[in-house]
A protein has these predicted regions:
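C-terminal and inter-domain tail/linker signature
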Residues: 1-148
Length: 148
């Protein structure tokens, strides 16, 4: 049986957990500099870019999420790792007390996010993210507003 020599803090699961808990949940963008490679390749719709621009897009997303839902918390409900890749299914909950495609709704949100990341040396080098934006729009009442 092989021995895993990777430090617990650099394993893909721990890197992903930290980006959610220390970044998105708190609004602290400094975690991006620590956990995302300078050459990050970001594929997520609305954030897609490479290098410094990709890292700035992730920082902006952290600020936007935290501004819209300051009490947000994340729970990794499922994950799978293969080589340097990790897939996670994350549950995000909170209250939309900040602006999100319109004025604050003050409604609770509970959405799922699927992420795939490639992690090397404790840093995210490539990322694909699929947050359930439709559920978010519906739960905050923005979908009804847009349908009018």
């Amino acid at each position: 049986m092989g021995t895993d020599t990777a430090s617990p803090d650099t394993r893909p699961y721990h890197v992903m957990r930290r980006i959610f808990e220390e970044g998105f949940a708190t609004g602290d963008t400094s975690v991006v500099d620590e956990l995302c490679s300078p050459g990050l390749v970001e594929h997520q719709f609305g954030l897609a870019a490479t290098g410094a621009q990709a890292r700035e897009h992730v920082k902006a997303a952290i600020r936007d999420v935290h501004r819209a839902v300051p009490d947000i918390w994340f729970c990794i409900e499922d994950f799978a790792e293969q080589g340097d890749k990790i897939w996670v299914r994350v549950r995000a909950r909170g209250t939309a007390t900040g602006p999100f495609f319109g004025p604050p709704s003050n409604k609770p949100i509970d959405i799922t996010v699927f992420d795939l990341a490639r992690v090397a040396d404790g840093r995210i080098v490539e990322h694909w993210g699929v947050p359930d934006r439709f559920a978010l729009l519906a739960q905050t009442g923005q979908l009804d507003r847009l349908a009018r």
